[in-house]
């Protein structure tokens, strides 16, 4: 299998709700907008997609919509399929594969704090259950557990279809160290604030929250960097500074969904508890920053 298979500019899709249910029409429309604006892959039902509060049926529906909408295009579907129970993660991975996803994104198990050996066995079981690419997802700030560089490299070398890692630890040194020890690894940025530093240090793509709103800019930044045109990539990165900052003023995806609502890209600003709408102060800050960007609605 070609491990260099799902890279480039990727969007961690929001999940729009309407009257308490997944707004399937809006979801498909948002994906079409990504396709039209140069994104290489969409990532349904990840952190940004509020996967933790979706039912399994809703989770599966979102994957099906993403696959169907991307059918016949060059845009790939990297489906969220993580869980802190290995048997459940395997089931989600199998569903994604059977329903046409091009690969899966699997988050480090959260809450139960497995050992590195436990993480190795968890991911090996997932990789052996499907024959599509698997991207590891390291986000210790949310999971309370970090997968080590050694474990990532061992999984990459032992499992043919584990092709890389989405790094959202904020630790650039770890990213550089990872590539120094295994340069074949596909390192993907999982934080918009450090997209440029990761890309300019050997990263092969981004999974972006900001690209829900500005897919064309994230696509341009990513591809300039991959083409080693770092001057243009840095220029776009600098232009995105204020929007990247405000989109994380509260827990993701609260700010990005608020921005999408303000831009008229979703009909209803709905979350599922325990997530809720932003404070009035932050709502105003998001609105103010939005005015500085050429986004529909402003």
From Swiss-Prot:
Catalyzes the condensation of (S)-aspartate-beta-semialdehyde [(S)-ASA] and pyruvate to 4-hydroxy-tetrahydrodipicolinate (HTPA). This is 4-hydroxy-tetrahydrodipicolinate synthase. Disulfide bonds: none annotated. GO terms for cellular component: cytosol. It catalyses: L-aspartate 4-semialdehyde + pyruvate = (2S,4S)-4-hydroxy-2,3,4,5-tetrahydrodipicolinate + H2O + H(+). It comes from the Bacteria. InterPro entries: Aldolase_TIM (IPR013785), DapA (IPR005263), DapA-like (IPR002220), Schiff_base-form_aldolases_AS (IPR020625), Schiff_base-form_aldolases_CS (IPR020624). It is found in: Cytoplasm. The active site is at residues 137, 166. It is an enzyme of class 4 (lyase). One of its GO terms (biological process) is lysine biosynthetic process via diaminopimelate.
